[in-house]
Amino acid sequence: MKVTFAGTPVELQGNEIKVGQTAADFNAVKNDLGAFKLSDIKGRKLIVAVPSLDTSVCDAEVRRFNAAAAGFKGTTVITISMDLPFAQSRWCGAAGIDKVITVSDYKERDFAFKYGVYLPNVGLLARAIFVLDEHNKVTYVEYVPEVTAHPDYDKALAA
């Protein structure tokens, strides 16, 4: 799949996810350096892939999903980036993020390749949204065409 990053076309690496398929389990790193597995989370999941929490669009995006998550029942919002866990923890504290789980894919890039969001030119994740039901069936996917743009919040939150 192709997206653009600051206007430059980039071919994403990894397996493109489609609605209806079962989402792959993946490994990541929690902010406390502990192991994270998608399979450890029960119920519905909204997975938010971002390039870096330290950018204005990613910052605004995670804040928006954090605010929305306050009203969710039975849905866990997971934000994943290549940021180091220490940076994620610092950013969450400074931004008051307390309803979203942030995890890092820096170590294995497991999520990057299993969900088809790896940007090889910069070593970051593309911006994407995945909504999974309680059985990990994919019910919504958005690979944002321009990585520096916002996702369609309304569609993602309605999914």
Where are these predicted regions, by residue range?
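Chalcogenol-based redox active-site neighborhoods
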Residues: M1-A159
